[in-house]
């Protein structure tokens, strides 16, 4: 059989952009997007994406060019997950929580030709563009403003606007034919940044094949069914909305887009549109629980929720499910192109007491259908740990859905893929039934509201402060976000009590990094605990931090039901 060959008929590259064309042909009467009063069908969304792709081609966007976007969960953000890769270009969704300096670092590193900006972030981008020349002399990306669909607001001077590109786009027969013909399924489809706060940010390059496989595995692992109504509470900028941007199209579902995610908005849209699915981190559960009683109306059928990040406490899962939600726990990371583990329900669990069922739901689960393998290995011997639910090791994975690597960072790519696995840096166990459960994060990661914060990055900023001699940052409990940074600092001799206070350092951090990364507490020590090799013992500092409490006014718990949470995303 070796003489059989691959040809154009039996070797078509895998890409999720084909889901869009299929949806337009198979579900012509299904609503694809709901956004306020705006409604689109799948044929209309297909037409809009084709027109935008044609306009991008007319602007000389070609294969492997980067096109960035800074926008909330609005229709444009969804459409660009198809229209940009239809041209062969690479989509770069940017975290809307970041400050101007961090976004400038990302743009310098990604070098996009075009930057789409939602009107809400136009002032921020003006500041970003002023910062870019201080890093290197490179042309600014062309700015294209995204207004509301029915807006009459004028774009930036001499620049185009998003809806204008769609109106002007005229796909030709040749361009239309090429839009769905990916050159190679290993070509990049998206560039997602795990961190943009250092001089060496990690831009994760995702392939068409990886996105295709991840989207399908989510459909199967989450049991999405046909025609899901998906509420966008998870930011699309985070790992392409865990690839649900493509999954919903594959099932001919409906995307319910909301600009600002609050508890009242969630409940309102669930009731208005019959939402069946949504994704979020456990932090969002607290918003839902603390919403007004009038918002928490009974659901005609359970809303399926896929959650990730820190493991939600059993009591939290129980309370959320009493509101009409059914929770499935998952695990993934940007480097894995979204979820790779799902806590799939087993029939025998139905016979267990409720508290045992919820305890089982807390686990991260078993590998998805398209992941080749997952294991937990001893970090020293590299041997698999016993499946006893007690012996901890590093979670490692392998499969065709994983990232291609880190952009312009071969050293980090090699380190991530050493020993033939993707090394997640997360510590966990495997239970006798094969289910994986995370027990700890790698030492320098703090999980705050689902966002990954590197303690090393926070420490770098603290060390920039003139009076700081030593600094170590660990996680401390936070009543709203789960964890938040806590800094332990040693001041230079003779500086104690003179000019530097806890407030001074917190203020300095807020001026030099994204606010969500800033320490909520600073503890001054005469000397930090160290081992015999002079290494700071963060384990001891974590024990101290566990006893610390964030003040209620810092937590914002009294206003939690009003606070916008669209920025909450997760390393699953």
From Swiss-Prot:
GO cellular component, one term: peroxisome
InterPro entries assigned to the protein according to its UniProt record, in alphabetical order: AMP-bd_C, AMP-bd_C_sf, AMP-dep_synth/lig_dom, ANL_N_sf
Main location: other
Motif Microbody targeting signal: where in chain: 570-572
Expression across tissues: Expressed in flowers.
Disulfide bonds: none
The protein's name in its UniProt record: Butyrate--CoA ligase AAE11, peroxisomal
Source organism per UniProt: Arabidopsis thaliana
Taxonomy of the source species: Eukaryota, Viridiplantae, Streptophyta, Embryophyta, Tracheophyta
Gene this protein is translated from: AAE11
